[in-house]
């Protein structure tokens, strides 16, 4: 449901899926420390851009924890496009609400720095840390 909300730019039940005191951490450092802030972020972010793809590749669930692997792409109103692979680590309450969600990102433009030498050859580009 959370992924669908981003794709449709509609709050389809943020109050129903997150606890009041949820802690939501994005892969690049922002952290939202309650449901009202998550709701504000969702609404505000969607005025600046749109999520065009958020595809679930696979997920694993055990007890109160779910790990979701996904591919994400957005298009911002200023013309910037971002895309990357990621993982969400989700912790659930006994009544099936999200109490913690941490995102981890991975660049798509991967390469082997040892492909041509025993010494690493790194690209001369700014690293995108998630």
What label would you give each PLM region?
Residues 1-10, 17:
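Short, aromatic-enriched amphipathic alpha-helices that serve as compact interaction elements
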Residues 11-64:
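A solvent-exposed, acidic/Ser-Thr-rich amphipathic alpha-helical stretch
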Residues 19, 92-93:
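Short, acidic, Ser/Thr-enriched surface-loop or helix-capping motifs
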Residues 47-48, 73-83:
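Short, cysteine-centered beta-strand-loop-beta hairpins and adjacent loop/turn segments enriched
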Residues 52-55, 69, 82-88:
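Short, surface-exposed coil-to-beta transition loops
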Residues 63-72:
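A short hydrophobic beta-strand element
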Residues 102-130:
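Low-complexity, intrinsically disordered terminal/linker segments enriched in charged
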């Amino acid at each position: 449901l959370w992924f669908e909300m981003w794709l449709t730019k509609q709050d389809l039940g943020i109050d129903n899926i997150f606890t009041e005191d949820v802690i939501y951490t994005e892969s690049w450092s922002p952290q939202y420390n309650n449901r009202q802030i998550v709701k504000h972020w969702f609404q505000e972010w969607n005025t600046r851009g749109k999520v065009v793809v958020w595809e679930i590749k696979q997920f694993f669930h055990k007890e109160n924890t779910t790990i979701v692997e996904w591919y994400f792409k957005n298009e911002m109103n200023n013309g910037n496009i971002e895309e990357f692979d990621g993982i969400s680590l989700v912790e659930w309450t006994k009544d099936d609400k999200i109490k913690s969600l941490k995102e981890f990102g991975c660049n798509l433009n991967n390469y082997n720095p040892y492909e041509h030498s025993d010494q690493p050859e790194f690209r001369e580009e700014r690293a995108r840390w998630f």
